[in-house]
Amino acid sequence: MGTGLENDKPIVVLTRRWPESVEIALAQRYALVRNENDAAFSADQLVAALTQADVLCPTVTDALTAEVFAAAARIGIRAKLLANFGVGFNHIDLAAAKANGLTITNTPGVLTAATAEIAMTLLLMCARRAGAGERLVRRGDWRGWYPTHMLSTQVTGKT
């Protein structure tokens, strides 16, 4: 992690890899510190990020506990913003973060459509036995259509 501002740019730490286009845009505007191995940060890494960066961008894999904030506070918390990548924030001790002067953001609503689409995918796969059919094809056991083969439930008209 950098020891100071590079070219007077605020230091932003990503605890996990983000989409490449986003990382490129961030690197143009900030002194960006990427997590090249894309593994969850340890408590020690989170403490280091809180004390050395201006902005920490955590994800659900980062346990920002009261203990992490207390350890960072003993050193001196530099970060002012936790820009959470995701909707959920139950991995962040909000009271401890606020007590240490951090602003916390998340992305509410960003997964609503995706969650509904995944639910529909699972519903259709179960009702129409799509997983079983795929396994037959992959094993080379597909013998073609016959009247009782892969009978399933119709979804149309159901609520």
Kindly give the residue locations of the regions a language model identified:
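An N-terminal-biased, well-structured beta-alpha scaffold segment characteristic
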Residues: 2-105
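Phosphate-binding beta-alpha-beta segment of Rossmann-like dinucleotide-binding domains, i.e.
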Residues: 100, 108-159
